[in-house]
Amino acid sequence: MSVRALAARPAALLRHRGLGPAVSDALVITQRNLLKYVRVPTLLVFSTIQPVMFVLLFAYVFGGAVNIPGVNYKDFLLPGIFIQTAVFGSMQTGIGLAEDISHGMVDRFRSLPMARSAVLAGRTISDTIRNLFVVLLMTGVGFLIGFRFHGGVLFAMAGILLAVLFSHAFSWISALMGLTIRDVESTQAASFASIFPFVFASSAFVPIFTMPGWLQAFAKVNPISLAANGIRALTLDQKTAHFVLGGNRWTHVWQALLSIAVMLVIFVPLSIRAYRKT
């Protein structure tokens, strides 16, 4: 179904609230957003360059300065890169919504007989799909430089799924910023300024126990640390995971899932409320 097909629906369906039609509408918007990468493939290319550069930079430039006894730094690094990629990739959700608002696309969508939830759901889903592609690409790059999954195929799939779920949850935070600020350049600047400290004050690139004491307290509850450590609990072998992360493997996984659930519970309603006010 296309956007034109949505416009051809009877007016009586304007305020339908059934789950089926709402899902269908969201998928239409998802398709519309993904087609942008087909028509302008350079957008997808440039969205993958930065993560690849970070992998190579930290693995070969900074990696020599990071010494974790008994642990291959690349095995420690890649889960952090997954989360960093997911977070920075999710910034596109807010930027895309701000762009749609500034170009009048949101007003056009409002005039169509479609579920109001479709615009937000379609945007976050399409960006999550793009982030999945980038995470898979990062996995391939990681294998080329020596990264390995040590927990088996199922744990590897679970780790990738955890990264994708985190990117989806973070997309709703970005959506709220885009809907609140509504200007593309301002949204981009605000997103980077607010996310950057969380990424680098986390365990994404170095273990928490190597940080100063005052920073450890923040890093331990940082959602990015929780997500990165949750993935490491699945990708490292059990002995190494216990040494690097401490505690039980599944505790870290559940903490990551809890952080995702908390973000969704808080920011999905706030984003929907902000969308209604646009």
Residues covered by each model-derived region:
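Junction motif at the cytosolic side of a transmembrane helix
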Residues: 2-11, 235, 239, 254-278
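Short hydrophobic, aromatic-rich alpha-helical segments embedded in or entering the lipid bilayer
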Residues: 2-5, 21-31, 202-245, 254
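Short helix-coil transition/hinge motifs at the ends and kinks of transmembrane helices
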Residues: 9-17, 68-70, 237-251
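Membrane-interface helix starts
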Residues: 31-50
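Hydrophobic alpha-helical transmembrane segments of multi-pass membrane transport proteins
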Residues: 53-58, 74-145, 170, 174, ...
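Short helix-capping/hinge motifs at transmembrane helix termini and TM-loop junctions
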Residues: 58-67, 145-150, 154, 181-183, ...
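Transmembrane helix segments
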Residues: 60-64, 178-225, 229
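Alpha-helical transmembrane segments and their short interhelical loops
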Residues: 116-191, 196, 249-272
